[in-house]
Structures are given as structure tokens and as C-alpha cells.
């Protein structure tokens, strides 16, 4: 059921942190030939491992259209099936974080979704593909599949990757994304902040200036920043002053060092290095896309927004991207230190970042509740 006459905050709901217990995770089977090399064939084996790891510790809801379900079932046939659920919900691409529902809970056993508008990261202004109607309709269907009610955020455009919360009243976003002309150009920064507070049940928004260099989402926060726990955060970093990421991360650090969260705490900040070598599209990869008219294209040599911060926290685990870079091991070390209670699971991510995001972008958590 769609709730149009109230907001989560008015009803006592809030968005819990990703590090809180999950009931499950949404994923979408990757097949879009303009996003994934060889129509998904290169990235699908990574999805198998991702599904293996997540479904071992929580329910896994996999969106896959009827045409591709036999393919998905065949590739997943060797995995235990009791926690894998197939949902016949069509989408235009596979970014469950951005097109799926954002979940809120009330601490009294109720869980609801939020239905934001989705316009493929910028609509007519700078969106990545022109036909995104199935993506925009998916959140309502995803909530319906789980029997969850859904708040209607009206015409407000937002992607799940553009927000991070601590579950204790603090929201972190980037100005580069939320103030971009392709999202909500008729709303002021103050109006956008008011919407975030009302719908996420929060008390304070911290605006970081920038995200990761060359991030085609207009620099989503989930690629540059993440919460470890309330009052403790990770920031993507480089010490190389000649790298274009240096100034972006420096600007974010200055904000975080001077900020306090909704409960007045100063942040403990951990710097998480970006890959030592820029991760770029190869000529072979560029040739293995099939683009539709009006779709954003990949070019050989194009630098990708590779970041270890785009990890995903499922129950008891950290799913960590690996790029075949010398910083891979350092990222494992830092994440292991930050999350001693979790198992760090490194998975190969080059085939994922070629699509434009990483494990956090692909997933959308469903918070656990006491029924």
C-alpha cells in the first residue's frame, strides 16, 4: 500500500544504519548490454559469489525477468537455495541501491519502504540512459513482494547511493550529487535537506562537497564515505597531490573534521586509500558493450570511479571490492580493523566497476524487525 498523506518522521519511523541487523538483501541480475560487458556474461560469475556470501547469512531477493530467469537459476544451481528468492520484477538495469526502496523502521516491529523518483542519475539533463520507467516502478513492486507498505515521496528524485545514515539521526550526502541540475533543480538546498529529514526520520544532514573523481552518478556519497558505527567513519583517500581525487577528499575531510553528528559527537575518521593505479576501461572492454541510442557510452582509457569504500555490510560480513591493485590488501587490513566483529570477504570487482558502480551500489538492505 502506498502512503501519500504522511511521512516517516511524522509516524515515528527512521532509516536504520546498514550495520544494523538485516532481514535480507535485494539484488538484480545484470544483463543490460550498455552497462555490462558481453551483456553481463563477465560480471555474472561475480554475482554468483556475491549471492553465495549474502544468502549464507540473510535472505537474498533476486530480481530477474522471466527471459533471464533460466540463466540465473542455472548459474546459481550449485548454491543452497533455501534463502534465495526469485522476484519476477522487470528493471532497466541492475542497481538495486539506487532504484530500490529505502527502508525505515519504527522500533516497534514495523517496517516500511520509501518510493523516491528515479531518473537514471539525471534525467534529460545528464542521465545515463533515456528509458528508465521500469527502474522507477521497481521500488513499489519490491515492497509489495515482501508485504511492506511504502511512503510516496512524490516527485522528489533520490538514489539510495546518495545517502548514508548512522541510525541515530545523522544523514551524510554530497553537494555534487544532491544539488545537481538533473535531480531536483527547482528545490533549494534547504528544501532538499527538509525532505531528507522528514523521510529518513533524521535530525541533521552533513553535506560533503564532493565524491569520487569521474563518478557518473554526480558523485554519490556511498563511493567516498561510509559509517563504521555512530561517530566513526571511513573516507576515501589519496596522498598523491597530483591525483584529481586529492582535492576532492581533502575538501570532504575538512568538513568532517569540523562537523559533529546529530548527537554532538566529533567523528573518528579512518582514511581508506583508493587504488594505487587508476582503474580504466580497456579497449577490449569498450568494444564489448552494446549501447542504445541516447545511452551514455564508455570510451577506452576512461578512468572509472573505483573505490574500496563501496563495500557492503551484510550480517556478519564486509563484502569488499578488489581491483587487482597493490592497495587491495591494505583495504582488507583497514576494514578488518574497523569491523573486528565481521568477516572481510574480498571479491573481484573490475567487472562490476566497468558497469559504473560496485557492491554497495548493487545491493539494498532490508532491515530486520521484531514482528
Swiss-Prot record:
GO terms for biological process: putrescine biosynthetic process. GO terms for molecular function: agmatine deiminase activity; protein-arginine deiminase activity. The active site is at residue 361. Signal peptide: none annotated. InterPro entries: Agmatine_deiminase, Peptidyl-Arg-deiminase_porph. This is Putative agmatine deiminase. Pfam families: PAD_porph. It comes from the Bacteria. Belongs to the agmatine deiminase family. Keywords: Hydrolase. It catalyses: agmatine + H2O = N-carbamoylputrescine + NH4(+). Its EC number is 3.5.3.12. Transmembrane segments: none annotated.
